C-alpha cells in the first residue's frame, strides 16, 4: 500500500474520480471517462475510487495506463480512502456516495447526472449548482425518471453518455 503512496505526486492538485454508481443509468461510460482522465492527468494527480471486484479491476487497468493516475480501490481501507478524499482539490462523482463523502469534508464536488436530478434532493451538501453537469432536458424531458435512478425508459439508459468529455474537462478547469 505504501508503494502507491510513494508514487503519488502531492505537489500537483489532487482530483478524485469515482466513476461508478449503483445504477447503470447513473454511470458515465468508462471510455468517455478515460478521455477526461487522459486530458487532465498531465496537469493533475488523479486518484480513482470505487469498490467491488469488477470495479477495482477496471480502475487498476486505467491506472496502469498513466503514471499520474492511481487506483485506491482494494488498496486502502475506507478510513484511509477518506483521508485521501479529505485532501482532494476536487472530487468528480456520479450521483453516488463518494460525492457526498467528499462534500462532507468541504471538498468541491463536480457531479455528473444521468437519469436523476440534483433538485430531487440528492445533490452533495453545500455545493454550488454550477458544479453539476446534467444531460440535456430538451433531449431527455422525462428526467428525473426516478428518485434513485433505478427506473428509466430504455431510451434513457445511455442519456448520461450524451454529455461530452469536453464539457466535463471545461467544468473541471472552471472549478479548480
Predicted regions and their residues:
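Short, Lys/Arg-enriched, disordered terminal segments
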Residues: 6-12, 42, 170-176
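Donor-binding and catalytic core of enzymes assembling or modifying cell-surface/extracellular glycoconjugates
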Residues: 30-115
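Short, solvent-exposed polar/charged micro-motifs at secondary-structure junctions
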Residues: 3-6, 57-58, 80-83, 141-146
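Nucleotide-sugar donor-binding patch of glycosyltransferase catalytic domains
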Residues: 71, 103-176
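Mid-sequence helix-capping/hinge segment at a functional interface
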Residues: 1-26
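Short, basic/glycine-rich phosphate-binding loops at helix/coil junctions
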Residues: 14-17, 61, 144-151
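Aromatic-acidic/polar surface patches that form glycan- and anion
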Residues: 26-29, 160-161
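Short secondary-structure boundary/capping segments
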Residues: 6-8, 38, 123-124
Amino acid at each position: 500500500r505504501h508503494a502507491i503512496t510513494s508514487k503519488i505526486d502531492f505537489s500537483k492538485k489532487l482530483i478524485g474520480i469515482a466513476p461508478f454508481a449503483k445504477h447503470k443509468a447513473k454511470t458515465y461510460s468508462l471510455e468517455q471517462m478515460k478521455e477526461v482522465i487522459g486530458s487532465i492527468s498531465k496537469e493533475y494527480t488523479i486518484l480513482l475510487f470505487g469498490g467491488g471486484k469488477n470495479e477495482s479491476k477496471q480502475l487498476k487497468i486505467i491506472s496502469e495506463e498513466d503514471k499520474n493516475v492511481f487506483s485506491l480501490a482494494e488498496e486502502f481501507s475506507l478510513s484511509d480512502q477518506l483521508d485521501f478524499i479529505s485532501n482532494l482539490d476536487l472530487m468528480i462523482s456520479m450521483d453516488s456516495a463518494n460525492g457526498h463523502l467528499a462534500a462532507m469534508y468541504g471538498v468541491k464536488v463536480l457531479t455528473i447526472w444521468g437519469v436523476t436530478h440534483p433538485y430531487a434532493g440528492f445533490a452533495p451538501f453545500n455545493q454550488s449548482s454550477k458544479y453539476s453537469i446534467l444531460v440535456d432536458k430538451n433531449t431527455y424531458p422525462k428526467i428525473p425518471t426516478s428518485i434513485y435512478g433505478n427506473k428509466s425508459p430504455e431510451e434513457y439508459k445511455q442519456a448520461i453518455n450524451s454529455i461530452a468529455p469536453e464539457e466535463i474537462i471545461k467544468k473541471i478547469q472552471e472549478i479548480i
